[in-house]
Amino acid sequence: PAGVLIGPYAHLNLHGSVTVTTADAIAFDQGNFYATGENTYTALSQSPTGSLTFSNASPGSIVNEGDISVAPGETVTLTGGAVVSTGELSAPEGSVTVAAIPSESTVKITQPGSLLSLEIDPIVPIATDSTATDSNVTISPLDLPSLLVASEHKHADSLSVNSDGSVSLTANTANAANAESQFSIGAGSTVVSGSITVDNFSANTASGQIAILGERVILTDAMLSASGQGGGGNINIGGAHKGHFSLPSAHETFVSADTQISADALTRGDGGNVVVWADDTTQYLGDI
């Protein structure tokens, strides 16, 4: 699809897992489900394999302003060309993955053992920095303290989806005219400005896993929690520890001062693992 918008009054409370994606195809054991065109539904009787195909050079964006929750142990996955979540995502004892896929790729989300992994195989070569034409991307994490973090001057308070599929944050300025400024978030950007929880309060076992991934990862006024009665879970922002290949690494990662991240052991066990990573630039102002 060209894009997915989940509005502020939407509430999804599901017993199973949920995947929201702008992929062109979702792989099953015996075939693919295609977003457009004809499908052979008899081949889709088995479970999805976790493989998504993005064949569009500019995959559609996802904006979530609502609340999505699933049953304990299930998963919530949001994958698109750019992903913005200002609502609530909840998967107790399970996993939440929010990932931006900037170009034509095949994506496979797996959980070997107890660790989440995400593989991205480009369908066509990705342009290098010297040849890329990423004109929609007008925000870098170094700009965000003045653009997104609430201050006496301005703060981002609404979202809009442009005709080209890009997403804009709209900030009200404090001048007399109360003019608006828009900051475009292009392909490969993941923005979280809501809550994501995978806590485990029901048993003495560890919590679940959270992964926020993309070429540019932005957390502003966000709350991420992977705490559990028997131990904390894993939170990966921008990639894995030391850029390990199990997760794609961001080029730039920004975490605002009003973002809170926790992976606590509530009654027993060890605290969890929190990784904030970028290959090029990481700016971290929040609390862990």
Regions found by a protein language model. Give the residues of each.
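Extracellular and secretory-pathway beta-repeat/beta-biased strand scaffolds
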Residues: P1-I288
